[in-house]
Regions:
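Acidic donor-binding loop at a coil-to-helix junction in glycosyltransferase catalytic cores
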Residues: 143-152
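Glycine-rich, basic loop-to-helix element that forms the pyrophosphate-binding segment
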Residues: 42-58
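A recurrent flexible, glycine/aromatic-enriched loop bordering the glycosyltransferase active site
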Residues: 97-98, 110-129, 143
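Short aromatic/hydrophobic "clamp" motif used to bind/position activated sugar donors
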Residues: 63
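Conserved donor NDP-sugar-binding/catalytic core segment of glycosyltransferases
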Residues: 75-104
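Non-catalytic, C-terminal membrane-associated alpha-helical segments of glycosyltransferases
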Residues: 178-243
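The conserved acidic donor/metal-binding loop of glycosyltransferases
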Residues: 67-71
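Active-site donor/metal-binding and catalytic loop motifs
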Residues: 162-182
Length: 243
């Protein structure tokens, strides 16, 4: 059973979408987390639909959505709920990556810019959201790339989307198809041309430093591969638009 004591009297149900059996380590963390209500493990597909249906099964005003490939510290929920204000609709937190190549890149970027202020990453993999916002949400049928679409939806309702600095969340780094992500970012208008150029410039500048921080040529080629895949997906979608 979830831990019952809750210092701020705000219970929060959890939604954990997963393809198969839920991550046992994450489930153990949630069951013992202060302020946690019921844990809803859903296997709907795609992920965007699973999130919506799961949240609507919850009974609490605020609902936590946590991806199956995440790990959270014991005080995660209490720390996040402290940031709730009447104007906020969703709150995410910066997570550290288990994937050493991506972790190196974000570590380098974080030395020059606050990762919680980056407008290109809403951190949808560990957030709390007002349940009522899901009632009229019409999610695209996506497994990857829903982040920006969902953030814009929340903002259009009049609420703010807030990202907190690193509180201890860990992303275990499920492999993603960056061609698919590039297609989604173009198709659903996540990035305009300016943001695309900004992303590519940042990746070009910081990738060598990430490789240097790991002392690994493999890190350089891994990150370069992701960048090329993302751009290929973006260009592919533009070509399809013209046909």
């Amino acid at each position: 059973m979830p831990a019952s004591r809750c210092d701020n009297d705000l219970k929060v149900d959890f939604v954990v979408p997963s393809r198969d059996a839920a991550n046992p380590t994450l489930m153990h963390q949630l069951k013992n987390m202060q302020c946690a209500g019921q844990i809803i493990n859903t296997h709907e597909k795609p992920l965007s639909i699973a999130r919506k249906k799961g949240v609507l099964q919850a009974d609490t005003e605020w609902v936590a959505m946590v991806d199956d490939d995440m790990l959270l510290p014991a005080n995660w929920l209490q720390s996040v709920t402290k940031a709730i204000t009447p104007k906020i609709g969703a709150i995410g937190t910066v997570a550290v990556h288990k994937n050493k190549h991506i972790a190196a890149y974000e570590r380098v970027v974080g030395t020059v810019y606050n990762l919680s202020k980056l407008d290109t990453n809403p951190h949808i993999n560990n957030i709390i959201i007002r349940r009522k916002l899901m009632e009229n949400y019409d999610p695209p049928r996506l497994f990857f790339g829903e982040d920006q679409y969902f953030k814009r939806y929340v903002q259009k309702t009049g609420f703010a989307w807030k990202v907190l600095p690193f509180l201890g969340a860990t992303h275990l780094g499920t492999s993603k198809n960056y061609v698919t992500i590039g297609i989604s970012y173009r198709r659903y208008g996540h990035f305009g041309f300016y943001k695309l150029v900004r992303r590519m410039a940042a990746r070009f500048i910081f990738t060598p430093f990430a490789a240097l921080s790991n002392l690994s040529v493999k890190t350089f080629w891994y990150l370069t591969k992701l960048n090329v895949e993302f751009l290929a997906g973006w260009v592919k979608e533009i070509v399809l638009e013209k046909l």
